[in-house]
């Protein structure tokens, strides 16, 4: 979720001015401090989408910046981003080889939000973010909900928008299943079925996200 803000300076403001870029560069060069010395997310939180849950199922990554998509320039307006991750998604995708050529790209179908439970959590996460942002002292600085937009109110609208703006957090697991069935990639010794001398020893063999 992206919110436009007022009376505060975000990285968007620095990035779109030459003086701002110089200030960021000098601060790091002279003091090893400032935006260039930090991770993008300055604030985090673990929360429950349902109070009845024993442990949190959502994780917040809040950044003092906003952008259209990863790799693109920051927005020209002042804003912050509250990214929410579903820690235990139910949706399941596929990764399939497309050729005997080891350099050929695989076909990846993530099927995000294909499970009803994930769609429910997505809508709850946006509503929870709105509730947090509506509280003082944040509320006095927020001028507009840029994404998904205040006009999106129903669960159906929020879920549809979540599908449009959602992205991975770059830590995929479970893409090379361990087991002995036809869908398994490795056995219990991490050896790849049908290929000698090859093992997979990372989180891709884990059946579920360890969070």
Predicted regions and their residues:
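Predominantly flavin-linked oxidoreductase catalytic cores and closely associated redox partners
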Residues: 1
């Amino acid at each position: 979720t992206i919110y436009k803000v007022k009376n505060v300076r975000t990285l968007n403001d620095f990035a779109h001015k030459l003086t701002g870029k110089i200030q960021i560069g000098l601060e790091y060069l002279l003091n090893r401090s400032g935006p260039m010395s930090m991770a993008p997310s300055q604030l985090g939180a673990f929360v429950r989408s349902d109070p009845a849950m024993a442990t949190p199922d959502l994780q917040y990554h809040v950044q003092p910046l906003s952008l259209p998509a990863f790799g693109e320039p920051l927005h020209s307006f002042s804003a912050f981003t509250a990214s929410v991750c579903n820690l235990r998604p139910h949706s399941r995708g596929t990764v399939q080889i497309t050729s005997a050529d080891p350099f050929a790209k695989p076909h990846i179908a993530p099927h995000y939000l294909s499970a009803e439970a994930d769609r429910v959590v997505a809508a709850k996460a946006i509503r929870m973010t709105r509730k947090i942002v509506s509280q003082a002292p944040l509320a006095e600085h927020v001028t507009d909900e840029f994404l998904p937009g205040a006009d999106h109110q129903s669960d159906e609208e929020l879920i549809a928008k979540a599908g449009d703006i959602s992205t991975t957090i770059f830590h995929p697991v479970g893409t090379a299943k361990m087991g002995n069935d036809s869908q398994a990639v490795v056995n219990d010794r991490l050896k790849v079925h049908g290929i000698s001398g090859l093992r997979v020893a990372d989180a891709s063999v884990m059946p579920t996200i360890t969070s």
